C-alpha cells in the first residue's frame, strides 16, 4: 500500500520496536531489567524470557503485548493520545512550560514543566522544529548499513554442524564484529533467525529496511543488519543535524 507518513512501522503503538520483534537483551546488568521482563511476561510474552540468555518476544506476540501494557499504564493513571503530534515546545526564559499539540484540525497547548522526548530517529521534522526554536542540541554518533538475508538452514549448519539435521535445536543466530585501528567498528545487529526483512521507510521516496521474527522463528530465511559506526566528524555536513540529512540523502539514492 501507499506509505502513510503519520502511521507506519516507525510510529504508533510500541514504536519501531513493535516491528523489530522484541529482542529484550540490553547488554547491561541493571537490576531493573528483570522487572521489565516480568512486565512483558505478565502482559502475555512467553515466560521463558525471564531466564533466556537472549529473551525474545516475537512480532506476532508483541502486537498484543504492547496493547496490554498500554492498558496497564492507563490503569495506573497514565494517558495515551493517539494521533496527537507535538508541533512545538513552549519555552519561557529557556524553560519548558508546555507543548503545542496538533490533533486533526485543532491545536492546543499542553501545560508541563518536564518532557521526556522519546521520538526515536525518524521524526525528523520534530528535530528541525526544536533546533529552530533554540533547544540545545548536538550531533551524536550512529550506525548505518545494510540488511543481509540468507537461508536459515545455512546458518543452522554453520553454527550446529551435523547436529543441525536433528531438528532438536532452535534456529541458530550469529554475531560478527570487527574493530579497526582507527576506531571504526563494523558489526552485525538485530539478527533475526527464521525472520523476514520488512520495509521501514517513514518518508516518501526513500528506502529503509528492518528485520523481524515471529515468536516461533520458523521462517525459511534469516537476516541481520551489517552496520558501521559513524562519528560526527564523518558527516559531510558538519551542522547540528548534518547526520540526519546524510541519512535522508542515502535513503533516497
Regions found by a protein language model. Give the residues of each.
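Residues forming the flavin
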Residues: 1-253
Amino acid at each position: 500500500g501507499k506509505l502513510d507518513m503519520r502511521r507506519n512501522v516507525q510510529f504508533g503503538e510500541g514504536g519501531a520496536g513493535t516491528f523489530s520483534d522484541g529482542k529484550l537483551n540490553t547488554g547491561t546488568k541493571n537490576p531493573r531489567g528483570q522487572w521489565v521482563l516480568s512486565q512483558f511476561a505478565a502482559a502475555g510474552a512467553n515466560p521463558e524470557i525471564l531466564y533466556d540468555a537472549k529473551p525474545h518476544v516475537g512480532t506476532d506476540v508483541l502486537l498484543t503485548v504492547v496493547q496490554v501494557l498500554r492498558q496497564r499504564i492507563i490503569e495506573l493513571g497514565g494517558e495515551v493520545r493517539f494521533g496527537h503530534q507535538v508541533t512545538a515546545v513552549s519555552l519561557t526564559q529557556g524553560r519548558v512550560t508546555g507543548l503545542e499539540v496538533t490533533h486533526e484540525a485543532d491545536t492546543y497547548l499542553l501545560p508541563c514543566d518536564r518532557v521526556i522526548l522519546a521520538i526515536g530517529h525518524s521524526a525528523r521534522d520534530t528535530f528541525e522544529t526544536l533546533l529552530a526554536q533554540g533547544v540545545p542540541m548536538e550531533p551524536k554518533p550512529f550506525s548505518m548499513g545494510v540488511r543481509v538475508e540468507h537461508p536459515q538452514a545455512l546458518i543452522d549448519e554453520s553454527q550446529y554442524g551435523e547436529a543441525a539435521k536433528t531438528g532438536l535445536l532452535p534456529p541458530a543466530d550469529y554475531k560478527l564484529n570487527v574493530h579497526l585501528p582507527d576506531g571504526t567498528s563494523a558489526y552485525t545487529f538485530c539478527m533475526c533467525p527464521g525472520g523476514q526483512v520488512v520495509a521501514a521507510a517513514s518518508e516518501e521516496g526513500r528506502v529503509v529496511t528492518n528485520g523481524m521474527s515471529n515468536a516461533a522463528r520458523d521462517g525459511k530465511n534469516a537476516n541481520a543488519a551489517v552496520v558501521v559506526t559513524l562519528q560526527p566528524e564523518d558527516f559531510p555536513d558538519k551542522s547540528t543535524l548534518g547526520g540526519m540529512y546524510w541519512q535522508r540523502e542515502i535513503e533516497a539514492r
